[in-house]
Amino acid sequence: MQTVKALRRVSEPLQWVRSVSYGRRFSALPNYSASDADFEDQVLVEGKAKSRAAILNNPSSLNALSAPMVGRLKRLYESWEENPAISFVLMKGSGKTFCSGADVLSLYHSINEGNTEESKLFFENLYKFVYLQGTYLKPNIAIMDGVTMGCGGGISLPGMFRVATDKTVLAHPEVQIGFHPDAGASYYLSRLPGYLGEYLALTGQKLNGVEMIACGLATHYCLNARLPLIEERIGKLLTDDPAVIEDSLAQYGDLVYPDSSSVLHKIELIDKYFGLDTVEEIIEAMENEAANSCNEWCKKTLKQIKEASPLSLKITLQSIREGRFQTLDQCLTHEYRISICGVSKVVSGDFCEGIRARLVDKDFAPKWDPPRLEDVSKDMVDCYFTPASELDDSDSELKLPTAQREPYF
């Protein structure tokens, strides 16, 4: 495995959609009359010289994103982009976590109470914020120190500069709760080397900071203990020049490389199995390998896959495969269709069932519907990718400002 220089830009397999030349618990968003301060406290603002920082500050929920948090982030980033006094922006988390994803417990209760419109509004605003990040006109930095799961990746990986640390843990475990990797995940996972994206999406396998550097998800690596030095240095900058910001981030580099146990050393096996056409073929090939050679990695991987929702596995594989040939806005559009179909229980209630089993009752015995891969039909999967207008004549497609913020492929 090739060694990499921490805090130096790697050659990025992720060609993020942007319009600049440098490569670079749920509720609706209501009026906040009673508790504006509470919502503001969940996303703090820090200003230094010519920069602004958004700090996720919901540590009791591991900085899980609520609807008000997403709304505040979107408003802040929009205003900062328009403010000529601000040269670049930064996002980080308080405590030991960057962002553990969406606040799915509140979503679970909201759906069960029949408030699906709240859920739809959350996803709409979340995906619009991801698109804003991916087309941002100013340099933006994400410091992914600590747990970075689910849409925590979606709100950070579009950034021009993506800093991982020795405390970073990235994972997309959505299939384990009957959902799918979203918030742009079908874009950035599909652009990882080989079929690594399919593997991460179907198993929920974790990556550490060094592995994120090695595969291109992160642009810089920094020891957690050195973050204050980096933040102090970039906080003094008065420029919007990405090259200057790059040099400042690169000041505290170390030589790092994935250790011998890293899953990245199994990329040939990953490509061999996860490059197959269907989930059934992936499982069958790995079962044959495990039986013939007693391959422990195959056994562990099979266990991870078989714990997931069969429907989610098939939806997720198709989502990643389609995302490989789509722009960011197209990925977000098809992810929005999947999410809305999931929370509306049009085909299945696996999302709520997965949350119940893992986070509510904690019996870890979800009753998936359908219960087996062979029971998941093509029509079921296709329903999740069908425009809303073709299902119920509604006009509930995700509307992104592509005319004003046109992406490139």
UniProtKB/Swiss-Prot annotation:
Pfam families: ECH_2 (PF16113). GO terms for cellular component: mitochondrion; ribonucleoprotein complex; ribosome. InterPro entries: ClpP/crotonase-like_dom_sf, ECH_dom, HIBYL-CoA-H. It is an enzyme of class 3 (hydrolase). CDD domains: crotonase-like. It is found in: Mitochondrion. GO terms for molecular function: 3-hydroxyisobutyryl-CoA hydrolase activity. It comes from the Eukaryota. Signal peptide: none annotated. Residues 388-409 are annotated as: Disordered. Residues 1-26 form a transit peptide. Belongs to the enoyl-CoA hydratase/isomerase family. Mitochondrion-specific ribosomal protein mS47 subfamily. This is Small ribosomal subunit protein mS47. It comes from Arabidopsis thaliana.
